[in-house]
Amino acid sequence: MSESLHLTRNGSILEITLDRPKANAIDAKTSFEMGEVFLNFRDDPQLRVAIITGAGEKFFSAGWDLKAAAEGEAPDADFGPGGFAGLTEIFNLDKPVIAAVNGYAFGGGFELALAADFIVCADNASFALPEAKLGIVPDSGGVLRLPKILPPTIVNEMVMTGRRMGAEEALRWGIVNRVVSQAELMDNARELAQQLVNSAPLAIAALKEIYRTTSEMPVEEAYRYIRSGVLKHYPSVLHSEDAIEGPLAFAEKRDPVWKGR
């Protein structure tokens, strides 16, 4: 892997650190490399959870590398099969990703965090989508994912004026799961990752699949859909060894041993 990405495997947890001084900005080359990492994570049966963070204490990521843009990299450049930052367009990832936001998450950096399943941020973190002030739009998920969380008036202000949102406000709006000190950030993210590892992998995959396929459906239609047999993971959960192991472990007062089948 390149000098821009540092990978650490802790059992079934993969930690990815973006390290591109000074602002952890992402060009097309780095985006391709991040895509390879996330696709390998998706396909590795030994890995259960990924944590993505930035090096240093100031920037999670400033988003698209404007130096690369100034040198000719186009806004519609090929950023790889996972989309910008390697994650924003992987729509079949059935393992959870935690964004440990250690500082500013601007533009594509904010969009990378929004593509994760959980956001844990340091109390000095700040979020913004300033693309309109640069003559472009946040089309790597920001303008699509943020309206699913925030009211339209707040979204409009963020995407049209580029206003920043601090960590505590992001927590109040439900953008982030937790706000902790900078010193506690990675330990807190690892604690959350371990909690996810303690849950059955097939159940996690089924939950992500259900969210992904039914989020825009009326509840009654969604019920019919998930019980129609078209989903991959939900029927597997119902007839899995893990579905037997969970209640058995509870009855025997021990931790379950998940097999993922």
Swiss-Prot record:
The molecular function terms in GO held by this entry are:
hydro-lyase activity; L-carnitine CoA-transferase activity
Keywords associated with the record: Lyase
The pathway it acts in is: Amine and polyamine metabolism; carnitine metabolism
- Asked if ATP-binding is a keyword of the record, the answer is no
Its top-level enzyme class, in one word, is: lyase
Q: Which reaction does it catalyse?
A: (R)-carnitinyl-CoA = crotonobetainyl-CoA + H2O
Enzyme Commission number(s): 4.2.1.149
Membrane-crossing ranges are none
Q: Which InterPro entries match?
A: Carnitinyl_CoA_dehydratase (IPR022852), ClpP/crotonase-like_dom_sf (IPR029045), Enoyl-CoA_hyd/isom_CS (IPR018376), Enoyl-CoA_hydra/iso (IPR001753), Enoyl-CoA_hydra_C (IPR014748)
Catalytic residues, chain numbering: E111, E131
Q: Which Pfam families match?
A: ECH_1
Q: Name one GO biological process term.
A: fatty acid beta-oxidation
Classify the source by domain of life: Bacteria
Can you tell me which family this protein belongs to? Belongs to the enoyl-CoA hydratase/isomerase family.
Function comment: Catalyzes the reversible dehydration of L-carnitinyl-CoA to crotonobetainyl-CoA.
Q: NCBIfam families from the entry?
A: PRK03580.1 (NF002936)
Instruction: Specify the protein name.
Output: Carnitinyl-CoA dehydratase
> Where does this protein come from, organism-wise?
Shigella flexneri
